[in-house]
Amino acid sequence: LVIYLILLGWCLVAFVAGRLLPTGHQALRLFEGEALAVVFLGFFAVPYQHLAGLPTLLDIRVSQQHRFLAPFVVGIAFALADLLALHFIRLPATGQLLPSFLQPFPYSFLYFVADAIYLEVIYRLLPFTILLSLLGHRQLTAGRTPLAFWIVAALCAVAAPYQLIVKAPPALMVTMYVLHFVFNMIQALFYKNAGLLASLSMRLGNYLLWYILLGMWLQWHL
C-alpha cells in the first residue's frame, strides 16, 4: 500500500501544481478532481488484487526486469510506431491536432505521469480486480487465462483509445486507434503476468517519448 500511496501522492501534487501555474498558457491541461478521486478509489482495490488472481504491486514472483524494464521498452516501441504514423500520414496545418503535447515542461512530466496512473487505475486496477475476483480468479490462480479476462481486456482496449479520436486524416485516426487497441491488450497481459506496476511502466515508456519528449521538442521549436 505504501507504493500506491506514493502514486496517489504524485497525482495530488499534479492536481495542485496545475492550478498554481500562470493561466496564460494555451491549452493547459489540468489533472482534474474526478481523476484524483478515481485514483483514491483505486487504493481500496489494491489489497484485493490477489483475490482476482493478479500479482500484487511488488509480488516476489515477478522479477524487476519483467515488472519495469520489459514493459517500459515495449511502451517506447509503441511510441516510435506512433511517431512513424505521424510522419508518414500528413497532418492538417491547423496546429490543433496535438494540444496535449504543448504542456509546459517540467509540468508536462508531472501531469502525464499522473495521467498514466489515472488511466491504469480506471482501465486496469478497478475493472480487472472487481470483475475477475467475481468471475475468473480460480482459473488465473491455477495458471489458466479465463474468458472473463479476455472480455475485460478487450472492452478496456476498445474504450481506452477514445481520446485519440480528433480532427485528423481518417488514415491517421484508424492507424492510431488500432495501435492503441493492441497497446492496451498487451498492457492487460503485462498486468496479468507482472502486476499493475508493469502495465504502468509500459504506459510511462510510451508517454516519455510520445508526450513528454516530443512535447518538449514542439514547445521549443514551434
Task: Go through each PLM region and give its residues.
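Alpha-helical transmembrane segments
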Residues: L1-F15, A70-F78, W150-A159
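Alpha-helical transmembrane segments in multi-pass membrane proteins
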Residues: L1-Q49, L102
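Hydrophobic membrane-targeting alpha-helices
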Residues: V16, P47, L80, L84, ...
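Juxtamembrane "helix-exit" motif on the non-cytosolic side of transmembrane helices
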Residues: V16-G24, H87-P92, P161-P169
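Non-cytosolic membrane-interface motifs at loop->transmembrane helix junctions
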Residues: G24-F31, Q96-L102, P169-F181
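Juxtamembrane helix-loop-helix connectors linking adjacent transmembrane helices
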Residues: Q26-R29, L51-A116, L132-T141
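Transmembrane helix-loop-helix hairpins at the membrane interface
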Residues: F105-L222
